[in-house]
Amino acid sequence: MLLFTIQEDGTSLWETHKEIGAAYDLPMLSYRAVVYPEVSAGTLDWRDISPDNIHPNDEGHKLIGQLVSRYLDSVYEDLDNIDDSSVAFDTPAYTADYYKDAKMLGASDITPREISGFEQGGNSVYPELFPDNFVTEGEGYLKFETECKCLGFFYLKKVDGKGGKYDVYVDGERKGTLDADFKGGWGNYGETQQILISKDSEKHTVEIKLAEGSTNTSLTILGIMES
């Protein structure tokens, strides 16, 4: 079963994952479809179902529980018409095996070609799980080479208003931005961002530099994700 929740601004991963659910014939339930029309119409106050911009409170979880229960009730009511014979799970994969042999690299696993502003250090959010970070409080720059199919970054979002925006370039082309600012949010946390996805492994030159116009400069890279 796939259960799709929602952020206060309406963001949901329904559009991202619904094709996977359809391909494997999985049940899909949308909390967004239940609450967002009511929030948009003003008949439901977001603060009644969430203490922040994303996490359900007790009332929010109650609604989710009702959504799941109603679906399960519909299944129980139709048991006589459901074929419960064993079926081999031999459905062809919907996507390529992009993340086979995936790994998370720390700062000490990278040999920079160029580096300034970044230092190797830890963090206070995941000090034991991810102790090997690239950290900058000033204007950091990092350049390294790697060979991979897919590339992403695991970095720290911060509520102190100091989180900077850093552009990521692959082979000279900007592929994404790491935005570490989460001012006013519920707390510091690790954010993942995919930068590159491909079926074939190739050598790449990766650069991380402060985005134009970013007045904040702090960034902690918790890990570099590759496959």
Question: What residue spans do the PLM features occupy?
Answer:
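Structural beta-sheet core signal
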Residues: 1-4, 153
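Catalytic His-Asp segment of secreted/periplasmic serine-dependent ester chemistry enzymes
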Residues: 7-103
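Hydrophobic transmembrane alpha-helix bundles
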Residues: 3-4, 34-47, 115-128
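Conserved catalytic region of serine esterases and O-acyltransferases that act on ester linkages
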Residues: 66-227
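Generic low-polarity alpha-helical segments
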Residues: 2-3, 11, 202
